């Protein structure tokens, strides 16, 4: 019997090509996602430098009826994440340390991606887990990965769908409210004005609105992404400790932190990530105590 040629297997299974981006996954269509056999058909990109372990991951994921594309070249994986995100529902990326191209990529644009990225690593240190999670990873799995952890990776897509649906709904409600308020205010302020006067005021208001929007856009463009360095994160933890878990809500945390360049939304997002990291660490401790 001839020895198994890993290179040939990888060349013929889940090849990354510059073709069709695959079926579009509408992340706002939350209920339609569950109308079929979801999570069967979940599209997963898996990168690992170890061809043997890559095939093990593929085999386990396929048992759960996931559509798996495997890759053992980091450049191909990065190219796909940048240019063909719509071909996948989530990505599982193996890393050796919290450095290099993958870390920079995730730190720079990971928060802007609709694609949940799960980190795979042999490093079980809390420091590594925290660094990746704070910088945009959806989850952190330690090798060797248990099949039951692979079975539920779809939860990260569900979370992403809920977030997108919440954002879209909020923006729609805000727009509808602003339109209703604008019409109501105009009617109350100008019930008896002549048609000419009303038209003139409408033109002035329209110019003011455009000027305000231009300033808002310019201000938004100048906003920088908040980097949660050790000092800022410690300030956050001190605020949570001061308030206590029962009272540690984003607005109160922000008041205690007294940092003018972060928003309530920034704090809310970081609070969610921090609790997620805590749950992962507890899971790791239970897992390794059980198997030790």
Curated annotation (Swiss-Prot):
UniProt KW keywords: DNA-binding, Nucleus, Transcription, Transcription regulation, Two-component regulatory system
Biased composition (Polar residues): 179-191
Compartments, as annotated in UniProt: Nucleus
Pfam families attached to this UniProt entry: Response_reg
GO BP field: cytokinin-activated signaling pathway; phosphorelay signal transduction system
Annotated region (Disordered), positions in chain: 168-215
Portion annotated as DNA-binding: 225-275
Assembly, per entry: Binds the target DNA as a monomer.
Name the record gives this protein: Putative two-component response regulator-like APRR4
Organism: Arabidopsis thaliana (Mouse-ear cress)
Gene designation per UniProt: APRR4
């Amino acid at each position: 019997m001839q020895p198994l040629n890993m290179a040939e297997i990888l060349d013929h299974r889940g090849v990354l090509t510059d073709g069709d981006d695959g079926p579009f996954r509408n992340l706002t269509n939350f209920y339609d996602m569950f109308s079929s056999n979801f999570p069967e058909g979940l599209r997963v990109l898996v990168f690992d430098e170890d061809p043997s372990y890559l095939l093990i991951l593929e085999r386990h994921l396929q048992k759960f009826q996931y559509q798996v594309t495997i890759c053992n070249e980091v450049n191909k994986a990065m190219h796909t994440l940048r240019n063909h995100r719509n071909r996948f529902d989530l990505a599982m990326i193996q890393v050796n340390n919290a450095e290099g191209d993958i870390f920079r990529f995730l730190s720079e644009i990971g928060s802007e991606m609709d694609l949940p990225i799960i980190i795979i690593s042999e490093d079980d240190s809390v420091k590594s887990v925290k660094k990746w999670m704070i910088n945009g990873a959806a989850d952190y799995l330690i090798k060797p990965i248990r099949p039951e952890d692979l079975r539920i990776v779809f939860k990260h897509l569900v979370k992403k769908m809920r977030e997108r649906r919440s954002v879209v709904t909020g923006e729609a409600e805000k727009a509808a409210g602003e339109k209703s308020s604008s019409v109501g205010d105009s009617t109350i302020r100008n019930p008896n004005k002549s048609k000419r006067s009303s038209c003139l005021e409408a033109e002035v208001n329209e110019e003011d609105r455009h000027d305000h929007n231009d300033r808002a856009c310019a201000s938004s463009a100048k906003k920088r992404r908040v980097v949660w360095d050790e000092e800022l994160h410690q300030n956050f933890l001190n605020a949570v400790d001061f308030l206590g878990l029962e009272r540690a809500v984003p607005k109160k945390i922000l008041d205690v932190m007294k940092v003018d360049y972060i928003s309530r939304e920034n704090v809310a997002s970081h609070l969610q990530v921090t609790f997620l990291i805590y749950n992962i660490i507890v899971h790791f401790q239970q897992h390794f105590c059980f198997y030790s």
